Amino acid sequence: MIILITNDDGFESEGIRLLKEIAQNFASEVWIVAPDADRSGAARSLDYPVKQFIKISQHSEREFSVSGTPADCVIIALNKIMNKKPDLILSGVNIGSNVGDDICYSGTIGAAMEGAARSIPSIALSQVYHDKIDWNNTKIFAPKVIAKLMKVGWPKDIVMSINFPATEKVKGVEFAEQGEYNIDGDLTFTENLNGSLSLNWSREHSGSGSVDKIKGGFITITPIKLDFTDYDILNAMKNSCAEEFSSIANTPIASD
């Protein structure tokens, strides 16, 4: 098996080194193509359309850093660096959870989505922490969870997001929805001497889905769709609103 690893915390992150160790349990080849700096919060954004250039640095035969986003890294790995299509993409291990609205912001999730968009099985892995990061639960349980997922399989346009709790004892594995945060939370701005602002964002969870289960000591697995369409609302609007909107195209355009 050929595995491609990336992340959003950067090429030097502890999490990606741990993920390399984990991947070696399954793979004949492990490739790392990751951002050359921390790109947390990059989502599935791309740098190359704006920058027009990307720097690729080779660190060993199969390890590269890229001056771009996590999604850039996946695109460049598949189209420039690797000579074969990977069988699996692993993104992470992220420092901190990816639940609730984090999923929209996360470069870890974004990189996995880029892989899934190309019909490559893709898994995002995240380790919850409080004061200090402890990778123990990921180290122990990630190989087992990945192996089980690969055995049962899942649709190629779905990303599997795994979150590992920070609790001393893991109670089990749960399949769970992404959950919710209070989007406003406690937002604090501090003005620095140079006139810039430092931002601290503390959010409370709603007590649902992955957010609640992780806090209770469970590993969570959340399937994430590439297609954001709400088909229930779409069909309802087609049935109830189509005629209302059809008149727009028939409205005469006033001449100057």
Curated annotation (Swiss-Prot):
Keyword Lipoprotein: no
GO CC terms: cytoplasm
GO MF term (any one): exopolyphosphatase activity
Source organism superkingdom: Bacteria
Cofactor note: Binds 1 divalent metal cation per subunit.
UniProt keyword NAD present: no
Annotated positions binding a divalent metal cation: D8, D9, S40, N94
Enzyme class, UniProt record, top EC level: hydrolase
Subcellular location per the Swiss-Prot or TrEMBL entry: Cytoplasm
UniProt xrefs under InterPro entries: SurE, SurE-like_Pase/nucleotidase, SurE-like_sf
One Pfam family of this chain: SurE
Keyword field: Cytoplasm, Hydrolase, Metal-binding, Nucleotide-binding
Reactions that this protein is recorded to catalyse: a ribonucleoside 5'-phosphate + H2O = a ribonucleoside + phosphate
UniProt EC number: 3.1.3.5
Cofactor: a divalent metal cation
Similarity comment text for this entry: Belongs to the SurE nucleotidase family.
Function noted in UniProt: Nucleotidase that shows phosphatase activity on nucleoside 5'-monophosphates.
Full protein name: 5'-nucleotidase SurE
Encoding gene, per UniProt annotation: surE
